[in-house]
Every structure is written in structure tokens, then in C-alpha cells.
Amino acid sequence: MYGYEWTESNGIFRLTIDAHIEKEIRPVFKEELDFFGMNAYWDYPDTDNPLLWAEGIRRYVVNGEVVAEAKEGGYYTKPKIKIHRKGLTLTPISVEDLWKENAALLTGMEQRAITFIQKTYTEYAAKGYSFVVAFSGGKDSLLVLDLVAKALPPENFYVVFSNTGMELDETLHTIEKAKRHWPNLRFEEAKCHMDPLQSWDEFGPPGRRLRWCCAVHKSVPTILKLRELTGQYDVQAVVYDGVRAEESARRAKYDEISVGAKNINQVNCSPILKWNTAELFVYSLYHGILLNNCYRYGINRVGCTVCPLSSSWRDSLTNNIYSASVKPLLTKVEEYAVHQDIPTERRKKYIEKDGWRTRMGGRGLPNGGNRITESVSNDTLTFSFASHTQNWWDVAPVLGPIIEKNEARAVQLIDRREYTVSVDETTGLLYDVSLCTQPSARCGQ
């Protein structure tokens, strides 16, 4: 990971280990300038190339000089732009010149990443592991996919898109573009059987410390998809991901190879862990790697439409630019504010100032409170629900596959063991634990 220093050429910086500037930086395109009405102050052409850069997300710079700055913003509030230099004429940044200035370093980084991918493949293929590229449609996973496609034959890995059902429409378009861009790769989709609107009704909006959404709509569906692809219940898989240390203090502590960090049988390999955004964008722009259009509007992180970890900057841009995508889940947050008895005149401020993101537990939810009692008798585990909001058979697959079913009775595979399950409107939900003392011979199903 290198810092950068500005040259005298328009919009060109030089990556160097001795640089004093190590801020996160991103290219700024015409679409973002138009969105903020910058054409009233600056003159710039209609071009696909970047026109300037933004440091620290909100500070617009031309060769190190801050020429404008964005302040505030939220779901219902558009950021305000403070212009420091009016009458500015912008010209397209030469991607060719930007690459020439940094080609030696970036070519070396590319080769190190490809070698890393090939070495990990050789090591874990000998142990019988399967291989997957975790794909989200964002800049990081697009870069990793490009590197893995260069390093490995297409038949040696799958590309798994974890479709949470909460992505921006633009991201879904990017997924389809990727399939056309890499027609020889094996794309697969992992998706939860529950609709996000249904799960948000059941569990409430996810919070910063209560991020149930990742497990329900991403992690578990991905594991189930890997089992399906390999035919193995205890599937051992190497997952190439786009994790980068620059993204957060927590990720800065990650290793390039993490064994069992997310799943006991999963090895996460992060080829671009040490890449920063400056390096990523220069490489991607020069090599013509597919870019999600969200970045052209200034959205610095793609992902779910409403996320408890997103910034006010991203909240504002996504809701202003992709309001149709954001509305369904933002409506759920607004409903949660109503259940929290937040006065009408304060609700928008409550939502923008992160009130909902701090939630823990079920307080304030229509279905909140303790509704389940548990008892064990004669090798039978019984759950009694004071009330229920959906059919148990719709929820049960989260625990494991149902391999036999007959009306109100079924056989379910949980943790490699078979349980007989019955649902009785009077007695409750019964799991017979007496039949699960040995691993099931059907655990590959």
C-alpha cells in the first residue's frame, strides 16, 4: 500500500512509499458534478474519464488544491457544496498518463496478487478444497474477479453472488454486465428463501451491533450454495474476497489468509488486502475493468440499499439518486421509528442521526417480547409459541435442509444429524432428539 504525491500534470499523482499523503481517494466523474449542479460554477466537458479527485470522500481536489467541499447530508438531506474556486475549467484526466506514472509499481502489485492466488490454489487444491470468488458487484470484488480470472482456469472456481435482495438496482445491472464481460466463468447466485421485507418485519432493522442481516441473507445462503455446488455437507472451500485493510480499523487487523474466520471449513484469501483506493482505481481504470455506475455518482460504497454501517454521505446519494431501490427498506426504518413513539416532526432527524442504528433486542417491534418457551421431556425438545406470524416450514430451512415431509411431520438435517419434526397447533413445535445420536448418512443432501 503506497501513498501518493501530486505531479504538475492535470490530475496525475505518483504512488510512492515515501509520500506524505495517504488519504482515501476516488475519481470524480461528470455524473457526480451534474448531480450537485457544479456546472453553474465550473466548465467541464461531457466525458467518461475522471475530471478531478475527491480526498476523504467529500473534498474535491485538483492536483492537491481543495476546490470544493461537501458538508452534511442524510437520507432526506442533500449535501451542501461549498465552492472554493469558481470559474474553474476542468479537462479530462488522461488514464494513459496516470498509468505511465505508476505502471512499474502497479504491475508489481498485480503480479504479487496473481502469484498469491496461484500459490493458495495449489496448496488447498491438494487438500481437496473447492474454490469460490465472493462477488458483490462492487469495485473490490470486480478487481478480485479480474485477478482470479487471470490467475486460474475458469473451470477451477465458481463466482458466487450473494444476492441479499437488498442491493441497489444498479448493482444488479452490474452483475448482469459481469456475466457478459466474463462469459466463460461459472456464475452462481446464493439467496435466502426469505424475502428481505419479511425478515425486516420479523427481526426489525439491523443495527450496528445487531447485524442479523449478514447471517440471514448472506453467510448462511452462501454456505448452502457451496454445499449444493460441491455435494458435500461439510464443504471445504477457499473464498477469494475483496477485503481491504484501508476500509476499517477492524479489517486492518486481518491476515491475507484467514482460516475458519467466517466458517470452520472456510479459508478466506484476500489478494488485495493491502491495496488502497488510489491503487485500485488507477489499475481498474487503465485495464478497463467493469465499474459499477454507482461510483460515477460519488457513491463510495455499494452494498445494501439501507445499511446500519453506511455513512450519511452514502445515505444521501443513494436515496436521492436511487430512491426507488431505497424506498422499501427505508420505509421499514420509518415504521420502526413510529413503533418507537418518535414524534412525527422528529422522525427524519431520528433516522438521519442514527437513532435506529443503535437498536438492540426486540423492544419497539410489533412482534417483540418473549413469545417462546422451551421444554425437554422424554428425548423430545418442544418449543411453544405464544403467537406466530408465519408458517414454521417457511422458516425451518434456515436451520438445515428438510429431507422428508408429510403434512405436519418432517425429517430435517441439522448439523449432520437427522431430527424428526412435528408441528401441532395445541402442543407446539417438537424436535425429537432421540433419533440424532449418529451422523446422518444423508448429510450430503
Spans of model-derived segments:
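Nucleotide-activated chemistry modules centered on ATP-dependent adenylation/adenylyltransferase
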Residues: 1-134, 139-445
